Amino acid sequence: MTAGRIIFLNGTSSSGKSSIARELLDVLDDGVFFHLAVDNFNAMRTKRVLRPEELDTALRRTRMGFHRSIAAMAEVGNDVVVDHVLSEPWRLLDCLSVLRPEDVLFVGVHCPLDELTRREQARGDRPSGLAAHQYDLVHRHGDYDLECDTSTASPRECAERIKDFLPRLPRRTAFARLHDRYLTDHDGPGVFDQGPPSAQV
């Protein structure tokens, strides 16, 4: 059975990941793609108020389950668009440990902080300051196959460029490089060191 392809969008809250994912489902005409978003997994959790230690445990388990759900979908041949926020190093390491590196197109979704703040205030469904808190964390591993800036390109434009890049995904993907750096080469650079430049969108 041929494994499915994974388009992995990583960026802060309000950076435009979900909008790009929706456009990707519309423009991708080679295969059947599914949009898996970490926010949707969080929304499935019980609504009762949890103690801080309960919430921390629940969130970690939710994200670990999310990562393994991505892997399970792709393993049986489903193509997947992933919408995630890698704001903690362990999330990236866990994804590297469960996803096949050669199947992942890793896309960095960027947006200037002032625009993120404006979007966050306009949407009104996110805690104030969430994007600012995540801003210096989500991209610190520094290596992608492709990057886009949603302040200069529309979600549709980003999706079209991702679609165009997908057939040209190099054999040694960003996930392969990161896997070697963090899970194989124990003497290599730290999790937040910069890697080689990726294609710019």
Regions found by a protein language model. Give the residues of each.
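Hydrophobic anchor at the beta1->P-loop junction of P-loop NTPases
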Residues: 9
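Conserved phosphate-donor/acceptor-positioning beta-strand/loop module used by diverse small-molecule
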Residues: 99-119, 148
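Conserved lysine of the Walker
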Residues: 17
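Loop/turn-to-beta-strand initiation segments
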Residues: 76-81, 103-105
